[in-house]
């Protein structure tokens, strides 16, 4: 079977503050992504979100339902966001083919039965990063190239957080039930992401860190603003951020991260900022 999955239950901030390093990593780090010829999925009980990957190498991969969904097919009651972080490939949705280059995105609406991933070149396979959330109705499937993303410049080189936010699967570009996805690229010389940090109790979030050079790493910060913890991240690893947690990071070089979130609303700017001087 080419599909593997695991489930993660939600944890309270009172419990998480007692975790040691390995317990934190076991609960929040997703480190089994981007395996050839495999679809890997992590089902988290935070907003019933799924994060995973599909890397078709020797043959195409079909998105299959998993037992926690108790559904006939994967998107029976769900929507799906895809961002390709590898070689050129395609996603076929109920017979319609969508070509995805590096850092292109695709939104797939609820009710689509057949989703098939393929790579153009097995020696440089597509690496499809997948995010999925529960949905209540069908919205049209839509491709969003990186060039079509809504781009926002934030930060400065002086504060080491100069970055470009690429909003891709988001209101104004794609209509979704609750899923939002995009990608933030740090400029050379900048290492901090999402600083000042924030929380948004209305939504959970997952980060996938990419473009981390070999022998470099990113220190991801999580936890309540007054009770922070850290998880060291390598390239192509993801981390789950509960609604009550900050989600920020600092790298030993610049890097990119793909963000995805779901929850109470679709207001990207709905967040509670934590002052830098008050973080603990």
UniProtKB/Swiss-Prot annotation:
GO annotation, cellular component aspect: cytoplasm
Cofactor(s) listed in the protein's UniProt record: Zn(2+)
Cofactor remark from the record: Binds 1 zinc ion per subunit.
Its biological purpose: Isomerase involved in ulvan degradation. Ulvan is the main polysaccharide component of the Ulvales (green seaweed) cell wall. It is composed of disaccharide building blocks comprising 3-sulfated rhamnose (Rha3S) linked to D-glucuronic acid (GlcA), L-iduronic acid (IduA), or D-xylose (Xyl). Catalyzes the isomerization of 5-dehydro-4-deoxy-D-glucuronate to 3-deoxy-D-glycero-2,5-hexodiulosonate.
HAMAP family with a match to the protein in the record: KduI
Membership in a protein family: Belongs to the KduI family.
Entry protein name: 4-deoxy-L-threo-5-hexosulose-uronate ketol-isomerase
Organism: Formosa agariphila (strain DSM 15362 / KCTC 12365 / LMG 23005 / KMM 3901 / M-2Alg 35-1)
Phylogenetic placement of the source organism: Bacteria, Pseudomonadati, Bacteroidota, Flavobacteriia, Flavobacteriales
Gene transcribed to yield this protein: kduI
